[in-house]
Amino acid sequence: MLNKTAITFLFIPICVTAFSQYKKYNFQQAKMGSPFNIVIYSIDSIKAEKAAVATFKMIDTLNEIYSDYLPESELNMLCRKSGTGAWVKVSATLFSILQKACYAGASSFGSFDITMSPVIRLWRTARREKKLPDEDSVFAAKQRTGYQFIQFDKVQKRVRLQKPDMQLDLGGIAKGETAQKAYIRLCHLGFPFSLIDAGGDIVAGDVPAGLNGWRVAINLPETEDLMNQRLLLRKKAVTTSGDIYQYLDINGVRYSHIINPVTGQAITNLRNVTVISDNGTNADWLTKACSILPIKKALQLIKKFQSTEVQIAVLENDKPRFFRSPGFTSYFEKTEVE
């Protein structure tokens, strides 16, 4: 699913001492509706390319499991059994991400819910037709939702969707999970000095000796302008959610592509949320949850996760105001002036 985010990484070396024989190689392919970038520091260009190709193939395999667009994806095959009472044997890969998603729902005060696809599809149509969805249609769609109605058989790795016509959408977690798995794959292939950019969900790995980390830039709310500060990351994941690309503007009100599971309505706050975490999965879904929750609750949510930080940027009188967890600024790149 296309889910562009207001974040980018910069191909700029932080330090070139002891750079030795390592060179940087960039590989890009379109995956999951977004450009996927794989950046590898390597002493062997041929081996780096082979590793990237193998990783892109793995991403294709994951897409065949996670996609809500591919009719025969494993996810959609599961959804066809919803409401029948049948337990469905699923792959360990799908079982794992569904468990993580339901944990996210329970941990986030219900602000993250992968069963919201019926409502999300109404809002996709609304953005395309440039008109708000009918309230009765939203209400009817919400009757088919609720992550609490996903049941798990942990022994036999089976899943049951209790409500009829349930449709799952992993768009708020799958790219972060995929980026994390892609980085792990590259490490197994011998390339820990690498970065994955899954359409804005970034997993920044290790770097060669002589480099301090990967530089990541963040957009300000409602604009393509970048913050003056850059993040400097190493062995961390980062994702930013905002509505700079996907939104519906009606009578001067901007409706985001992010839907509040409680109300079924698109959020209208002018907010960018950036989450730094130890893994891409948490960074991905936490940005969505923190975009929906009141700022105080969002900061409370982040406290539940070790080594995780958040920045919430809001517009007040056309100027950005920042709310941050205590450790967020420690990831800002230090300048000579500082």
Predicted regions and their residues:
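Mature catalytic core of soluble alpha/beta enzymes
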Residues: L2-A6, F19-E338
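Hydrophobic h-region of N-terminal signal peptides that target proteins for export
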Residues: F11-F19
